[in-house]
């Protein structure tokens, strides 16, 4: 059986590892480096460069050098995050055939999956060169907050690269696997993962080979790229003040600024000051212009202070969801290149009240963890059980636009949940199942993931058909939704994908607005519930009145008709109390009608019993046919 490899497909850098005996080991690439820049370049002659060679020539070929592609994977071209990204990168982002965000290089369009596949191929080739045999299977890591479309797109990238992706594993979970492989003492750890493009935090409990994720949170559009852009903007603004030229409008100059910004950021983790020196960055009528600016660590920290602060909210939420206090955390693991920044380390220490553990390599630990998971799947690593979670609540839209959860956030996966629903109208032959992800009570306030129709429901009064909706989340965090009509056994299902990704603002809005707007949400939900109850009573009363109205007196009938009219008027408004009051009034007014209906049913039932008794012969176990004349 060929070796299963573990790959950390990162925004900025990627890394590949394997299990060497009982220890995970990073494999060097063709250039002898342990990590590979996630950069792909296309040259004029059609040649394709990947990794460091691609990164080296970016300044001279900015429009055809693709980087930070992970930020686009699984997202639609109309996604606000993609719109924001268009102004940040020198290459062109275009709308793909299915509405997804694609990129253009030398006149050809590429999907993010294809570009990611080029990087995965380089990882695969490095592993094959090291092992001396073909590699066909892999475990690939993704941010914990990646949605279903992004996870599916990552699997597709693996497929394009010639890899069967046996498992998609969350990056912080992978880091915890690598950290805790040789530790059996029961520990609660926090993994703080600030990478090139995404931020995740996960709370885990480790003990006796069991790695149980208690909660996860994060931001899918926050990472080193954003830190670089703050430096780029600062340098460009300073140059514009001094020379009157905006370097952001020149793609070649912008690429040089980006490279220098990344270099400055790294240098300032170990030095107090860095001199940015870019000769011949631009020119004006009087000749060439040079950029020379001193950047201090203090200035950098001031520029990115709010970005670092944005990582603390998810940490608070993750602890809250895990039901833990800061003091309950035994160890904080730092992951991702940005966690090397002293200010980031200080922020983590200030929040958790303990110095973070720095014994793991933040650039390699995720790939090492992926290799451990690969070893588990291969059977080389025994007695390791990984229990991960789904990051956001999943559910469907029900009557009145209410979001009905089926699987709550931070539920251990794989998992399967079912619930039975019914129709809203008489003789309804089809239902539309709309799937949402989020934390708000109303569906429209959450992120819609997809929809599908269940057709061929036999005609029946509303509320009679039984439609079973099942959510199935596999170990990769990919969702499948089934709907089944219990009467006909007709089924329909959808694998959730391709509705654009969940941006940082989307996720923050879902969780934070859920707290801030709890009262308003509750009021809206109460209104929908009151209207649903009112309409149900109205419907049943009108039907009963039409069928049994002749069984009550004129006064009672008039009272019921008045109640119906008043409830209809109340239902047109937004006053919850008025709707509830008029609903109760109609229930009271129609009590006589209910008694008359009950009496009529009792009468017919007794008549039927009497007929049956006439035909009974007093003998043991003898069946009597009512239609046969009595002897």
From Swiss-Prot:
Alphabetical keyword list: ATP-binding, Chaperone, Nucleotide-binding, Phosphoprotein, Stress response
Family annotation (InterPro entries): ATPase_NBD, Chaperone_DnaK, Heat_shock_70_CS, HSP70_C_sf, HSP70_peptide-bd_sf, Hsp_70_fam
Protein name in the entry: Chaperone protein DnaK
The keyword Phosphoprotein appears for this protein: yes
Keyword presence, Translocase: no
A Pfam family per the record: HSP70
Function according to Swiss-Prot or TrEMBL: Acts as a chaperone.
PROSITE patterns according to UniProt: HSP70_1, HSP70_2, HSP70_3
Organism whose genome encodes this protein: Caulobacter vibrioides (strain ATCC 19089 / CIP 103742 / CB 15) (Caulobacter crescentus)
HAMAP family named among the record's database cross-references: DnaK
Family as reported in the entry's similarity comment: Belongs to the heat shock protein 70 family.
Entries under PANTHER family matching the protein: HEAT SHOCK PROTEIN 70KDA
Superkingdom: Bacteria
Any GO molecular function: ATP binding
Positions where Phosphothreonine occurs in the chain: 198
Induction trigger: By heat shock.
């Amino acid at each position: 059986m060929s070796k299963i490899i573990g790959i950390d497909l990162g925004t900025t850098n990627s890394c590949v590892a394997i299990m060497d005996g009982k220890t995970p080991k990073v494999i060097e690439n063709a250039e002898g480096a342990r990590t590979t820049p996630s950069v792909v370049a296309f040259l004029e002659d059609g040649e394709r460069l990947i990794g460091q060679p691609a990164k080296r020539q970016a300044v001279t070929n900015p429009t055809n050098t693709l980087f930070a592609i992970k930020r686009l994977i699984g997202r639609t071209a109309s996604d606000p995050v993609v719109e924001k990204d268009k102004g940040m990168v020198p290459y062109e982002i275009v709308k793909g055939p299915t509405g997804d965000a694609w990129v253009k290089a030398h006149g050809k369009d590429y999907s993010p999956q294809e570009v990611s596949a080029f990087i995965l191929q380089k990882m695969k080739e490095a592993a094959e060169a090291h092992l001396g045999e073909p590699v066909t299977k892999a475990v690939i890591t993704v941010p914990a907050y990646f949605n279903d479309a992004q996870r599916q797109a990552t699997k597709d990238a693996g497929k394009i690269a010639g890899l069967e992706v046996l498992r998609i594993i969350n990056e912080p979970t992978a880091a915890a696997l690598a950290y805790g492989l040789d530790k059996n003492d029961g520990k609660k750890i926090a993994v703080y993962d600030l990478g090139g493009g995404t931020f995740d935090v996960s709370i885990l409990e480790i003990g006796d080979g069991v790695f149980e994720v208690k909660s996860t949170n994060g931001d899918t559009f926050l990472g080193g790229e954003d830190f670089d852009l703050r430096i780029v903007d600062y340098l460009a603004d300073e140059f514009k003040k001094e020379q009157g030229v905006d370097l952001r409008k020149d793609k070649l100059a912008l690429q040089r600024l980006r490279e220098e910004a990344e270099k400055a950021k790294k240098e300032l983790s170990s030095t107090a000051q860095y001199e940015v020196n870019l000769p011949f960055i631009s020119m004006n009528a009087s000749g060439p212009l040079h950029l020379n600016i001193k950047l201090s660590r203090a200035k950098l920290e001031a520029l990115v202070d709010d970005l670092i602060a944005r990582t603390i909210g998810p940490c608070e939420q993750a602890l809250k969801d895990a039901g833990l206090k800061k003091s309950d955390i035994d160890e904080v693991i730092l992951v991702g290149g940005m966690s090397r920044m002293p200010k980031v380390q200080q922020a983590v220490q200030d929040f958790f009240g303990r110095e973070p553990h720095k014994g793991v390599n933040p650039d390699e630990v995720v790939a090492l963890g992926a290799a451990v998971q690969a070893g588990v799947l291969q059977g080389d690593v025994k007695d390791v059980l990984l229990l991960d979670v789904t990051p956001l609540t999943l559910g469907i839209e029900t009557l009145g636009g209410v979001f009905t959860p089926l699987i709550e956030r931070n539920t251990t996966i794989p998992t399967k949940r079912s619930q039975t629903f019914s129709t809203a109208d008489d003789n309804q032959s089809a239902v539309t199942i709309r799937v949402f992800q989020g934390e708000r009570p109303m569906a429209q306030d959450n992120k819609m993931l997809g929809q599908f129709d269940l057709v061929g429901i036999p005609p029946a009064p509303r509320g009679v058909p039984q439609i079973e909706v099942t959510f199935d989340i596999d170990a990769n965090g990919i969702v499948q939704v089934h709907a089944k009509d219990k009467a006909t056994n007709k089924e329909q299902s959808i694998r959730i994908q391709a509705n654009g990704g969940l941006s940082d603002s989307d996720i923050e809005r879902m969780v934070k607005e859920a707290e801030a707007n709890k009262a308003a949400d509750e009021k809206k939900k109460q209104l929908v519930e009151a209207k649903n109850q009112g309409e149900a009573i109205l419907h049943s009363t009108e039907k009963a009145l039409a069928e049994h109205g002749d069984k009550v007196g004129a006064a009672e009938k008039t009272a019921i008709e008045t109640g119906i009219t008043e409830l209809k008027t109340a239902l047109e408004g937004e006053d919850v109390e008025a709707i509830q009051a008029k609903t109760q009034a109609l229930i009271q007014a129609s009590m006589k009608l209910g008694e008359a209906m009950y009496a009529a049913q009792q009468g017919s039932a007794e008549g039927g019993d009497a007929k049956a008794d006439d035909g009974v012969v007093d003998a043991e176990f003898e069946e009597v046919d009512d239609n046969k004349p009595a002897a």
